[in-house]
Every structure is written in structure tokens, then in C-alpha cells.
Amino acid sequence: VNYALTIKKVKMSAMFLAHRKFIRISLRSRGDVDVNLFARRYFNGGGHKNAAGGKSFLTMQETIDHYVRSVREFAEEGRLG
């Protein structure tokens, strides 16, 4: 999950892991991007400012679609820097 942050303009990364009954989402960020807030708001999770996680009980595709919509909303609020 940290590897994507080595790319210069990437400020937030995510990894989705399928478990038997849910999808676990791991989030990382750098700078002022607060993935703790993101995880709490969109994935019933939490953590720290630059490292957080959550869960989804949707399918993998539905979870990814929800993530993409959520990132867009988060960006529109000016929270991606």
C-alpha cells in the first residue's frame, strides 16, 4: 500500500483485500491528506492521519466504485491538497 506513495504526485493510496465476508481497505497518505477522516467517513474505519483502514461489506467491484466516488467527493472538498 505504501509503494504508490513513492510516485511523486501521488498523495493517497489504497489496497483492497478480499476476506470471506468483507473487503478490508488499507489507506496511506502523505502530507496533509487525512486518511483517518476518509476511512471514518466512507468505510466505517479509522486510524492515524497518514495510515488508516476500514471495511466494506459490498462486493469488490462495488467497493472500488464506492472508493472512486468517495475520493472524488473528498477531492471536491479540497481534502486532497
Map each language-model feature to its residues.
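Gly/His-enriched, cation/cofactor- and phosphate-binding structural elements
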Residues: 1-81
